[in-house]
């Protein structure tokens, strides 16, 4: 009897082993949907971005008007642009929930998968940042100026590095052109790294909510989780469609409706909402270099999480003290996001500084201590 083609064909069997016959823990919850949702977000962003790039002009004299042209004159251009802009927000919501899931259930102990994930996050942030510059509105221009200028804090090479990135002595046409190039290129690098992410994940198999070995009780991915993922797809598409059609400008900045003007500074320069927590940490430190290092460390601290794991248990499901700390960290990050969007004045300055200190304390001190304490309590 001939073998099934999906198990023998060199190309199809890769798909089969990844999406059809993949042995999956039988008890993974809705929190495990976000990986596939991120894949869907990436596909949506690449497709809508491709159509936008067909009509966009990467030149400072016509970038703003080309975006207006897309919205006014291109067939369904307004829908493509709104989907792309709000798709980015949904992408980051899914990313942060995906990271929070990995943190809560101890998935970071799969070190290769986790570390590749952190690299993907950094590239995603870079892609979103350069993409935000492309419409060439006020916040695009000043956001690019302020954030790239942070590199000048690096000793010796800083000023040279900033001018090299700008392609001149200020944010100008050369900057816009190269940012468009990077914005087009980086998503494909992210696709490649996603493949590596999945490769390492399938080496170990998925984690599960209780953090115990699930080899004795696994089920095929299809049909169980493929249909479960489809439900997530419909919910995500519904949310993106609702945002794009009913509230397209809800998460954007009104300053970006004004064409870029190097002679007029907006009253409050701030990035998109998904970077505000890191921006608040940057602003909390009066020293420029210190702020830049804190900004970088606020993301790269995720690489230290596997090394700082002190508990004998993988998941937080049976660790009440660490659970409380986890939700306090979530609340702390929300406070930082709020502070990042506020003007630099009291009481926001001191709240931001306290929230920044506690953010790092959770990772470096409180979680390791709680894990150690819970180990002691297990022996009682």
Curated annotation (Swiss-Prot):
An example molecular function term from Gene Ontology annotations: metal ion binding
Gene3D superfamilies found in the cross-reference section: Cytochrome Bc1 Complex, Chain C
GO biological process terms, semicolon-separated: mitochondrial electron transport, ubiquinol to cytochrome c
Membrane topology: Multi-pass membrane protein
Cofactor binding notes: Binds 2 heme b groups non-covalently.
InterPro entries reported for this sequence: Cyt_b/b6_C, Cyt_b/b6_C_sf, Cyt_b/b6_N, Cytb/b6-like_sf, Cytochrome_b, Cytochrome_b_C_euk/bac, Cytochrome_b_N_euk/bac, Di-haem_cyt_TM
Residues the entry annotates as binding heme b b562: 84, 183
Cofactors (names): heme b
Positions contributing to heme b b566 binding: 98, 197
Binding site for a ubiquinone: 202
Highest taxon of source: Eukaryota
One annotated Gene Ontology cellular component of this protein: respiratory chain complex III
Segments passing through the bilayer: 34-54, 78-99, 114-134, 179-199, 227-247, 289-309, 321-341, 348-368
Protein's cellular compartments: Mitochondrion inner membrane
Keyword terms, alphabetized: Electron transport, Heme, Iron, Membrane, Metal-binding, Mitochondrion, Mitochondrion inner membrane, Respiratory chain, Transmembrane, Transmembrane helix, Transport, Ubiquinone
Pfam families: Cytochrom_B_C (PF00032), Cytochrome_B (PF00033)
Oligomer and partners: The cytochrome bc1 complex contains 3 respiratory subunits (MT-CYB, CYC1 and UQCRFS1), 2 core proteins (UQCRC1 and UQCRC2) and probably 6 low-molecular weight proteins.
Family assignment from sequence similarity: Belongs to the cytochrome b family.
Other remarks in the entry: Heme 1 (or BL or b562) is low-potential and absorbs at about 562 nm, and heme 2 (or BH or b566) is high-potential and absorbs at about 566 nm.
Functional description taken from the UniProt entry: Component of the ubiquinol-cytochrome c reductase complex (complex III or cytochrome b-c1 complex) that is part of the mitochondrial respiratory chain. The b-c1 complex mediates electron transfer from ubiquinol to cytochrome c. Contributes to the generation of a proton gradient across the mitochondrial membrane that is then used for ATP synthesis.
Protein name, per record: Cytochrome b
């Amino acid at each position: 009897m001939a073998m099934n083609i999906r198990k023998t064909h060199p190309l199809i069997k890769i798909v089969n082993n990844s999406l059809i016959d993949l042995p999956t823990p039988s008890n993974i919850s809705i929190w495990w949907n976000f990986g596939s949702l991120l894949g869907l977000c990436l596909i949506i962003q690449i497709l809508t971005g491709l159509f936008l790039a067909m009509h966009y002009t990467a030149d400072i004299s016509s970038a703003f008007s080309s975006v207006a042209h897309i919205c006014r004159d291109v067939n369904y251009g307004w829908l493509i642009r709104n989907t792309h802009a709000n798709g980015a927000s949904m992408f980051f919501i899914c990313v942060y929930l995906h990271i929070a899931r990995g943190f809560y259930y101890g998935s970071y102990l799969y070190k290769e998968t986790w570390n590749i994930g952190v690299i993907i996050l950094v590239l995603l942030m870079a892609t979103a940042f350069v993409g935000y510059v492309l419409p060439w509105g006020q916040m695009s221009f000043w956001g690019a100026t302020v954030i790239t200028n942070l590199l000048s804090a690096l000793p010796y090479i800083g000023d040279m590095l900033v001018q090299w990135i700008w392609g001149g002595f200020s944010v100008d046409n050369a900057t816009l052109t190269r940012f468009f190039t990077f914005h087009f290129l980086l998503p494909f690098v992210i696709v490649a790294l996603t493949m590596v992410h999945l490769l390492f994940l399938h080496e170990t198999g998925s984690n599960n909510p209780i953090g115990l070995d699930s080899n004795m009780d696994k089920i095929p991915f299809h049909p169980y989780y493929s249909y479960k993922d489809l439900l997530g797809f419909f919910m995500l598409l519904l949310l993106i469609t609702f945002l794009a059609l009913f509230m397209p400008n809800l998460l954007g900045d009104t300053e970006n409706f004004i064409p870029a003007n190097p002679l007029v500074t907006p009253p409050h320069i701030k990035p998109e909402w998904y970077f505000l927590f890191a921006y608040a940490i940057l602003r909390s430190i009066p020293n420029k270099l210190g702020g830049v290092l804190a900004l970088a460390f606020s993301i790269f601290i995720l690489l230290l999480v596997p090394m700082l794991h002190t508990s004998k248990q993988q998941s937080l499901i049976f660790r009440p003290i660490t659970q409380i700390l986890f939700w306090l960290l979530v609340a702390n990050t929300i406070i930082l996001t709020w502070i990042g969007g506020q003007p630099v004045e009291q009481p926001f300055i001191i709240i931001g500084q306290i929230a920044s200190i506690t953010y790092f304390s959770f990772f470096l001190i409180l979680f390791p201590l709680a894990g150690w304490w819970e180990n002691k309590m297990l022996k009682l």
